[in-house]
C-alpha cells in the first residue's frame, strides 16, 4: 500500500474518531465542547474575562467524562463478571486524571496576565511555568500509552526530531529564557506523539482490530498527538510574531495587522488544543 493511501486512511480514521468524540451524549462532553467553543471565540475576540471564566472548566469536564466512563465500566463488570469492551484499568484512569490536573494548572498559568504582557521576558516566564505543568501532563500520557503497549519506533522519532529542533530554534529566538523548559516539554510532547502513532494501539488483543469500527476512539490517538504539536508550535509562533512586531516598530496599520494575525493564531491554538486533548483522552480510556 502506498504511503499516500496509508495517510489518507489514517486521516479518515481520525475524522471518524473525532465524529464519535463530538457526538457523545453525555452532559460533561456537551459542556466540554461548549466551553471549548467559547474559549476559541474568546481568544479570537481578545476577551480575557471570558477566557478566565471558561478555560479553567475544560480539563475538569474532560476528567468528569473519564470518571463517568470508569463508573459505567465498573457497573458492567459487576453485572457480567468481566470487562470485554475496554482495556482501561483503574491505574489508567488515575494517570489520565492526574495528567488532566497538570494540564489544568498549565491552562491557568498560560491565561495569566504575563501571557499577553508587552515585555517578552514576562511572556517567557509565563511560558516556562506553563511548560513545566504540561510536561507533567505529558508524562501521564506517556505512562498510559506505554501501559497500553505502545513503543517508540525509529521512524516515528525521526519524523518528529526536525519538528522538535524547529521548536527549540524558535524558542531560542522568541523566548531565550524559556528555552530549557520549552526544550524539555517539547521532548516530552514528541514522545507522546510518537507513542500515540504506534499502530499497535489501533489493535486489540491477539492482533485483531480493537472494535472493527472506523470510529474507534483508539484511532484518534495519532491525530491527537499531531494536533497537540501543532497547537504548541503555534504558541511559539505567537511569541516570535510578537517579538518581531516589537523590534520592527511597526506603525498603526502594521500593529493592527500583527494583532489580527495574533488573534487568529491564538484562536487556532485553542481549537487544536481542545480537539487534541479530547482525542487523546478518549483513545486512552476506551
Give the residues covered by each predicted segment.
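Polytopic alpha-helical membrane-helix bundles and their juxtamembrane interface segments
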Residues: 2-286
Amino acid at each position: 500500500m502506498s504511503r499516500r493511501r496509508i495517510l489518507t486512511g489514517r486521516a479518515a480514521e481520525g475524522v471518524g474518531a473525532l465524529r464519535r468524540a463530538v457526538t457523545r451524549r453525555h452532559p460533561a462532553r456537551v459542556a466540554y465542547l461548549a466551553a471549548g467553543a467559547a474559549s476559541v471565540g474568546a481568544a479570537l475576540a481578545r476577551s480575557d474575562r471570558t477566557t478566565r471564566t471558561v478555560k479553567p472548566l475544560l480539563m475538569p469536564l474532560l476528567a468528569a467524562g473519564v470518571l463517568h466512563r470508569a463508573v459505567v465500566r465498573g457497573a458492567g463488570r459487576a453485572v457480567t463478571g468481566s470487562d470485554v469492551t475496554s482495556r482501561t484499568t483503574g491505574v489508567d484512569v488515575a494517570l489520565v486524571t492526574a495528567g488532566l490536573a497538570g494540564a489544568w494548572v498549565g491552562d491557568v498559568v498560560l491565561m495569566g496576565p504575563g501571557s499577553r504582557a508587552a515585555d517578552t521576558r514576562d511572556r517567557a516566564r509565563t511560558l516556562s511555568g506553563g511548560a513545566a505543568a504540561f510536561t507533567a501532563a505529558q508524562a501521564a500520557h506517556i505512562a498510559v500509552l506505554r501501559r497500553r503497549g505502545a513503543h517508540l519506533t525509529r521512524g516515528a522519532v525521526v519524523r518528529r526530531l526536525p519538528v522538535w529542533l524547529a521548536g527549540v530554534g524558535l524558542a531560542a529566538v522568541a523566548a531565550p529564557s524559556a528555552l530549557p523548559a520549552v526544550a524539555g516539554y517539547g521532548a516530552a510532547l514528541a514522545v507522546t506523539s510518537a507513542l500515540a502513532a504506534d499502530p499497535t494501539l489501533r489493535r486489540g488483543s491477539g492482533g485483531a482490530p480493537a472494535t472493527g469500527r472506523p470510529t474507534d476512539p483508539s484511532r484518534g490517538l495519532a491525530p491527537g498527538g499531531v494536533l497537540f504539536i501543532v497547537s504548541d508550535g503555534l504558541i511559539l509562533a505567537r511569541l516570535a510574531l510578537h517579538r518581531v512586531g516589537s523590534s520592527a516598530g511597526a506603525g498603526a496599520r502594521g500593529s493592527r495587522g500583527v494583532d489580527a494575525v495574533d488573534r487568529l493564531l491564538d484562536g487556532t491554538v485553542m481549537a487544536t488544543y481542545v480537539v487534541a486533548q479530547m482525542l487523546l483522552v478518549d483513545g486512552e480510556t476506551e
